[in-house]
Amino acid sequence: MLYGFDIGGTKIELAVFNDKLERQYTERVETPKDSYEQWLDVIVNLVEKADQKFACKGSVGLGLPGFVNHETGIAEITNIRVADNKPIIKDLSERLGREVRAENDANCFALSEAWDEENQQYPFVLGLILGTGFGGGLIFNGKVHSGQIGMAGELGHLQLNYHALKLLGWDKAPIYDCGCGNRACLDTYLSGRGFEMLYRDLKGEALSAKEIIERFYAADKTAVDFVGLFIELCAISLGNIITALDPHVIVLGGGLSNFDYLYEALPKALPKHLMRSAKVPVIKKAKYGDSGGVRGAAALFLTK
């Protein structure tokens, strides 16, 4: 059996899948906040419980909300303080007596979508999350491409370019600080949070993404103008990403992926930001939603 974990700041979810990635069992618990040992204990206990339930020694894949250094096995997960900068893979492997694999949650999301029957026709699937943050996962022929140390796909930490700053207005463009230590990272603009901050700073009113989108569909001029600007900002940024990576398909996840107008507007806005000979990839909504993380974590053992 394939065990997939979605490790979050507030909850830890285990889902058990068969080798066809069909879910057999799920359990969620609160994320311990008191100590690293307690955090490890919770994961070990969930694995041992699943082993007993399914009378097997299942494979263990982790989806983590941060960067996993594949050279050192250290995970940088700042929103889970007790496990940040710890040798998670080594410690869990020793405790469980088996190999443990881990990737960041964006890679797991992308891997889950790449293993969907409809997407297996595409050699290169790019998954993009437009949620609390903006991140990416690169899947080549059904396998995560994580680069030299595991940093490939950290697209949220690319920075706004000349055309994006010109679009926002040289004298009024809001420049946001990013948690990575840099400024003007895509994570702070193309995420759901960035969508809201841009509206506030450019239009002078604090609204939720849901409220902005509702006003857009109600033909509110301010919201319509803002969405047009946001689509153009996305097209500029995705144009750079597509030029560099040339994916066959882009799958969008996260809260903003439910804004259906994106799938109509982005393919029309992209060509002017690409080379003449470039091909606009298929852009589609994620199929597995909140289940993508655990499903992709489980699929780590189908791909290496």
From Swiss-Prot:
The keyword Transferase applies. Zn(2+) binds at residues 157, 178, 180, 185. It catalyses: N-acetyl-D-glucosamine + ATP = N-acetyl-D-glucosamine 6-phosphate + ADP + H(+). It is an enzyme of class 2 (transferase). Pathway: Cell wall biogenesis; peptidoglycan recycling. Its EC number is 2.7.1.59. ATP binds at residues 4-11, 133-140. PANTHER family: N-ACETYL-D-GLUCOSAMINE KINASE, ROK (REPRESSOR, ORF, KINASE) FAMILY. This is N-acetyl-D-glucosamine kinase. It comes from Mannheimia succiniciproducens (strain KCTC 0769BP / MBEL55E).
